[in-house]
Amino acid sequence: MALPELQTLRYELHDGIATITLHRPDKLNAFTTRMGGELIAAFDHTDADDAVRAVIVTGAGRAFCAGADLSGGGQTFDYAARPQAAQQETRVGEVYRDGGGRVTLRIYRSLKPVIGAINGAAVGIGMTLQLPMDMRLASTEARFGFVFARRGITPEAASSWFLPRLVGMQTALEWCFTGRVFAAQEALERGLVRSLHAPDELLPA
Protein backbone atom coordinates (compact mmCIF):
# COMPACT_ATOMS: atom_id res chain seq x y z
CA MET A 1 0.00 0.00 0.00
CA ALA A 2 1.61 3.25 -1.16
CA LEU A 3 1.77 6.15 1.26
CA PRO A 4 0.17 9.30 -0.20
CA GLU A 5 2.07 12.58 -0.40
CA LEU A 6 2.44 13.99 3.11
CA GLN A 7 2.32 17.71 3.84
CA THR A 8 2.05 17.77 7.64
CA LEU A 9 4.05 14.65 8.53
CA ARG A 10 7.43 13.11 7.81
CA TYR A 11 7.72 9.33 7.49
CA GLU A 12 10.91 7.29 7.78
CA LEU A 13 11.56 3.55 7.98
CA HIS A 14 14.86 2.28 9.37
CA ASP A 15 15.68 -1.19 10.69
CA GLY A 16 12.00 -2.08 10.97
CA ILE A 17 11.10 1.06 12.94
CA ALA A 18 8.74 3.52 11.26
CA THR A 19 9.04 7.06 12.62
CA ILE A 20 6.09 9.37 12.05
CA THR A 21 7.00 12.99 12.80
CA LEU A 22 4.36 15.69 13.16
CA HIS A 23 5.93 18.33 10.93
CA ARG A 24 4.54 21.83 11.28
CA PRO A 25 7.35 23.17 13.49
CA ASP A 26 6.56 26.81 12.70
CA LYS A 27 3.08 26.21 14.18
CA LEU A 28 4.29 24.00 17.06
CA ASN A 29 2.85 21.06 15.10
CA ALA A 30 -0.70 22.28 15.64
CA PHE A 31 -3.24 19.68 14.55
CA THR A 32 -5.28 20.22 11.39
CA THR A 33 -7.89 18.22 9.51
CA ARG A 34 -5.24 17.36 6.94
CA MET A 35 -2.84 16.14 9.63
CA GLY A 36 -5.56 13.88 10.98
CA GLY A 37 -6.15 12.35 7.56
CA GLU A 38 -2.43 11.89 6.99
CA LEU A 39 -2.00 10.18 10.36
CA ILE A 40 -4.77 7.71 9.51
CA ALA A 41 -3.14 7.05 6.13
CA ALA A 42 0.25 6.57 7.77
CA PHE A 43 -1.11 3.96 10.17
CA ASP A 44 -2.92 2.20 7.34
CA HIS A 45 0.48 2.06 5.63
CA THR A 46 2.39 0.73 8.65
CA ASP A 47 -0.21 -1.99 9.18
CA ALA A 48 0.09 -3.08 5.55
CA ASP A 49 3.90 -3.01 5.41
CA ASP A 50 5.42 -6.23 6.76
CA ALA A 51 8.80 -4.47 6.99
CA VAL A 52 7.44 -2.33 9.85
CA ARG A 53 7.84 -3.94 13.27
CA ALA A 54 7.06 -0.91 15.43
CA VAL A 55 6.03 2.73 15.07
CA ILE A 56 7.37 5.84 16.83
CA VAL A 57 5.39 9.08 16.82
CA THR A 58 7.17 12.34 17.67
CA GLY A 59 7.14 16.04 16.80
CA ALA A 60 9.48 18.31 14.86
CA GLY A 61 11.09 21.24 16.63
CA ARG A 62 10.32 22.22 20.22
CA ALA A 63 6.77 20.86 20.49
CA PHE A 64 5.08 17.50 20.18
CA CYS A 65 1.71 19.06 19.33
CA ALA A 66 0.42 22.33 20.79
CA GLY A 67 -3.22 21.42 20.20
CA ALA A 68 -5.62 22.20 17.38
CA ASP A 69 -4.72 24.89 14.88
CA LEU A 70 -7.12 27.71 15.78
CA SER A 71 -5.80 30.18 13.22
CA GLY A 72 -9.15 29.99 11.44
CA GLY A 73 -10.78 31.84 14.33
CA GLY A 74 -14.53 31.34 14.52
CA GLN A 75 -14.44 29.20 11.38
CA THR A 76 -12.04 26.66 12.88
CA PHE A 77 -14.80 24.18 13.69
CA ASP A 78 -17.18 25.06 10.85
CA TYR A 79 -16.76 21.67 9.21
CA ALA A 80 -19.78 22.14 6.95
CA ALA A 81 -17.92 24.91 5.13
CA ARG A 82 -14.97 22.67 4.30
CA PRO A 83 -14.50 20.28 1.40
CA GLN A 84 -13.33 17.69 3.95
CA ALA A 85 -16.68 17.86 5.77
CA ALA A 86 -17.58 14.33 4.69
CA GLN A 87 -14.45 13.00 6.40
CA GLN A 88 -15.43 14.67 9.67
CA GLU A 89 -18.72 12.78 9.66
CA THR A 90 -17.19 9.36 9.13
CA ARG A 91 -18.47 6.72 11.46
CA VAL A 92 -16.20 4.62 13.63
CA GLY A 93 -18.35 1.59 14.22
CA GLU A 94 -21.84 2.90 14.93
CA VAL A 95 -20.68 6.23 16.35
CA TYR A 96 -19.90 9.51 14.63
CA ARG A 97 -16.47 10.73 15.77
CA ASP A 98 -14.70 14.06 15.81
CA GLY A 99 -11.51 14.27 13.76
CA GLY A 100 -9.29 13.60 16.76
CA GLY A 101 -11.38 10.62 17.78
CA ARG A 102 -11.00 9.05 14.35
CA VAL A 103 -7.23 9.36 14.69
CA THR A 104 -6.93 8.02 18.24
CA LEU A 105 -9.14 5.04 17.48
CA ARG A 106 -7.05 4.31 14.38
CA ILE A 107 -3.89 4.36 16.49
CA TYR A 108 -5.60 2.09 19.03
CA ARG A 109 -6.32 -0.43 16.26
CA SER A 110 -2.72 -0.44 15.02
CA LEU A 111 -1.38 -3.94 14.38
CA LYS A 112 2.14 -2.75 15.25
CA PRO A 113 3.30 -1.48 18.67
CA VAL A 114 3.14 2.33 18.86
CA ILE A 115 5.56 4.35 20.98
CA GLY A 116 5.04 8.05 21.65
CA ALA A 117 8.26 10.06 21.92
CA ILE A 118 6.91 13.25 23.49
CA ASN A 119 9.61 15.78 22.73
CA GLY A 120 7.96 19.01 23.90
CA ALA A 121 4.66 20.75 24.57
CA ALA A 122 1.67 18.39 24.34
CA VAL A 123 -1.64 20.08 25.08
CA GLY A 124 -5.20 19.63 23.86
CA ILE A 125 -5.19 17.08 21.09
CA GLY A 126 -1.42 16.89 21.54
CA MET A 127 -2.27 15.27 24.86
CA THR A 128 -5.17 13.10 23.75
CA LEU A 129 -3.37 11.92 20.60
CA GLN A 130 -0.81 9.99 22.65
CA LEU A 131 -3.25 8.17 24.95
CA PRO A 132 -3.93 5.13 22.72
CA MET A 133 -0.23 4.55 22.12
CA ASP A 134 1.20 1.44 23.74
CA MET A 135 4.00 3.30 25.47
CA ARG A 136 4.98 6.93 26.00
CA LEU A 137 8.47 8.27 26.66
CA ALA A 138 9.02 11.98 27.22
CA SER A 139 11.71 14.60 27.10
CA THR A 140 12.52 16.25 30.41
CA GLU A 141 11.43 19.49 28.72
CA ALA A 142 7.98 18.21 27.73
CA ARG A 143 4.86 19.77 29.22
CA PHE A 144 1.35 18.36 29.22
CA GLY A 145 -2.15 19.75 29.59
CA PHE A 146 -5.82 18.83 29.25
CA VAL A 147 -6.79 22.45 28.67
CA PHE A 148 -10.30 21.81 27.36
CA ALA A 149 -12.10 23.14 30.47
CA ARG A 150 -10.29 26.44 30.03
CA ARG A 151 -11.79 26.66 26.55
CA GLY A 152 -15.29 25.69 27.67
CA ILE A 153 -15.28 22.39 25.78
CA THR A 154 -15.19 18.73 26.75
CA PRO A 155 -12.10 16.54 26.21
CA GLU A 156 -12.19 14.98 22.75
CA ALA A 157 -10.64 12.10 20.83
CA ALA A 158 -12.10 9.39 23.10
CA SER A 159 -9.85 10.66 25.91
CA SER A 160 -12.55 10.21 28.57
CA TRP A 161 -12.19 6.47 27.93
CA PHE A 162 -8.40 6.25 27.55
CA LEU A 163 -7.15 8.60 30.27
CA PRO A 164 -8.67 6.99 33.42
CA ARG A 165 -7.35 3.62 32.28
CA LEU A 166 -3.82 5.02 32.20
CA VAL A 167 -3.67 7.22 35.29
CA GLY A 168 -6.77 6.36 37.33
CA MET A 169 -10.04 8.25 37.71
CA GLN A 170 -8.85 10.70 40.37
CA THR A 171 -5.87 11.97 38.39
CA ALA A 172 -7.88 12.03 35.16
CA LEU A 173 -10.58 14.19 36.74
CA GLU A 174 -8.06 16.52 38.38
CA TRP A 175 -6.28 17.15 35.10
CA CYS A 176 -9.53 17.65 33.19
CA PHE A 177 -11.24 19.84 35.82
CA THR A 178 -8.28 22.17 36.39
CA GLY A 179 -7.07 22.38 32.80
CA ARG A 180 -3.60 23.12 34.14
CA VAL A 181 -0.37 22.51 32.27
CA PHE A 182 2.10 20.30 34.15
CA ALA A 183 5.70 19.21 33.84
CA ALA A 184 7.12 15.94 32.56
CA GLN A 185 8.04 14.84 36.09
CA GLU A 186 4.38 14.82 37.12
CA ALA A 187 3.48 12.88 33.97
CA LEU A 188 6.03 10.27 35.05
CA GLU A 189 4.88 10.15 38.67
CA ARG A 190 1.21 9.77 37.69
CA GLY A 191 1.93 7.00 35.18
CA LEU A 192 1.21 8.84 31.94
CA VAL A 193 4.73 8.27 30.62
CA ARG A 194 7.11 5.38 31.20
CA SER A 195 10.38 7.31 31.44
CA LEU A 196 12.02 10.71 31.00
CA HIS A 197 15.06 11.42 28.86
CA ALA A 198 17.30 14.33 27.98
CA PRO A 199 16.04 15.89 24.73
CA ASP A 200 18.88 14.52 22.59
CA GLU A 201 18.49 11.05 24.10
CA LEU A 202 14.73 10.66 23.63
CA LEU A 203 14.60 9.02 20.20
CA PRO A 204 17.62 6.74 20.80
CA ALA A 205 15.87 5.49 23.96
At which residue positions do the language-model features occur?
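Charged catalytic carboxylate motif
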Residues: R34-E38, G99, R106, A205
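Glycine- (often His-adjacent) and acidic-residue-rich active-site loop
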Residues: G59-R106, A122, G152
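Phosphate-coordinating loops and pocket residues in cytosolic domains that bind phosphorylated ligands
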Residues: A30-T33, A66, Q75, R150, ...
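Conserved CoA-thioester-binding segment of acyl-CoA-metabolizing enzymes
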Residues: M1-A60, T76
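Crotonase-fold acyl-CoA enzyme core
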Residues: L105-A205
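Hydrophobic/aromatic residues within transmembrane alpha-helices
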Residues: I20, V57, D69, L129-L131, ...
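Histidine-centered beta-alpha loop that forms part of the nucleotide-sugar donor binding/catalytic region
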Residues: H23, A68, N119
